[in-house]
Amino acid sequence: MMEEEECGLGKSCARSEPVAAAQPAGSPGETPAVAAESPELANYSSKCVFCRIAAHQDPGTELLHCENEDLVCFKDIKPAAPHHYLVVPKKHFENCKYLKKDQIELIENMVTVGKAILERNNFTDFENTRMGFHVSPFCSIAHLHLHVLAPADQLSFMSRLVYRVNSYWFITADYLIEKLRT
């Protein structure tokens, strides 16, 4: 079942029940028009800003080159570090809370893309990065997205709080992978 909710940036996003994120095209959570358009849009919500960006329907967002056809990457509109990128799956997943063990590869691919974007922008000190996810209900956008921040030692005081490692509201990609494996 899909409901609209305010999810940040003054936009409305679709909120789904945990199982809806993994349902196939034509599932109860999608409108018939969207599900019928194409298999690639099976988990697409026109009300979700990240779904629109991933579908190249937001001309104001510059997508960065990404070697993974299932992901898109772009700069965060409110950067917390000199390098602050978001890696977003084209498929709509509400947030990391709804991921299962069989989606570990997705998270690993998101990290790989994040590192590649940093390298392409001449940043290679991966010990000085922060890659992670906000945990519900602290997600500003109800669409899974990996924050890639570097250099981590240049985060402001507030940003160090907002992106605090393995807190109640932000977890690293490594921590998420570890939790999904257990």
Curated annotation (Swiss-Prot):
Gene Ontology cellular-component annotations: cytoplasm; nucleus
Give UniProt keywords alphabetically. Answer: Cytoplasm, Hydrolase, Nucleotide-binding, Nucleus
**Cysteines paired by S-S bonds:** none
**Region annotation Disordered: residue ranges?**
1-34
Enzyme class, one word? hydrolase
Where does the UniProt annotation locate this protein? Cytoplasm; Nucleus
Q: Which CDD domains match?
A: aprataxin_related (cd01278)
Q: Which PROSITE patterns does the protein's record reference?
A: HIT_2 (PS51084)
Q: Where is the active site?
A: 145 (tele-amp-histidine intermediate)
Under PANTHER family, the record lists: ADENOSINE 5'-MONOPHOSPHORAMIDASE HINT3, APRATAXIN-RELATED
Q: What does this protein do?
A: Exhibits adenosine 5'-monophosphoramidase activity, hydrolyzing purine nucleotide phosphoramidates with a single phosphate group such as adenosine 5'monophosphoramidate (AMP-NH2) to yield AMP and NH2. Hydrolyzes lysyl-AMP (AMP-N-epsilon-(N-alpha-acetyl lysine methyl ester)) generated by lysine tRNA ligase.
Family membership: Belongs to the HINT family.
Assembly, in brief, is: Forms dimers to octamers and even larger oligomer. Interacts with CALM1.
Name this polypeptide is given: Adenosine 5'-monophosphoramidase HINT3
Source organism of this protein record:
Bos taurus (Bovine)
